Curated annotation (Swiss-Prot):
GO terms for biological process: translation. HAMAP family: Ribosomal_bL31_1. This is Large ribosomal subunit protein bL31. Part of the 50S ribosomal subunit. It comes from the Bacteria. InterPro entries: Ribosomal_bL28/bL31-like_sf, Ribosomal_bL31, Ribosomal_bL31_A, Ribosomal_bL31_sf. It comes from Chlorobium chlorochromatii (strain CaD3). Keywords: Ribonucleoprotein, Ribosomal protein, RNA-binding, rRNA-binding. Binds the 23S rRNA. Signal peptide: none annotated. One of its GO terms (molecular function) is structural constituent of ribosome.
């Protein structure tokens, strides 16, 4: 095997731009900045909003029923 062909693998700190959370991991990059992390992502925090599709389905069924009667 050839020696010294792989990039240097260092410990880096990942910083969230949104909430400021940081953690240490290993990477070939000198630093990592992420837009959103698990501390502030709506899916992980439970603040996820659910789209109301029931109203849309009812509206479609009303339109479809009108066209079926005609």
């Amino acid at each position: 095997m050839k020696q010294d062909i792989h990039p240097k693998y260092n410990e880096v700190t990942v910083v969230c731009a949104n909430c400021g959370n940081s953690f240490v991991t290993r990477s070939t990059r000198p630093s990592i900045k992420v837009d959103i992390c698990n501390n502030c992502h709506p899916f992980y925090t439970g603040k996820q909003s659910i789209v109301d599709t029931a109203g849309r389905v009812e509206r479609f069924n009303k339109r479809f029923a009108k066209k079926a009667q005609a």
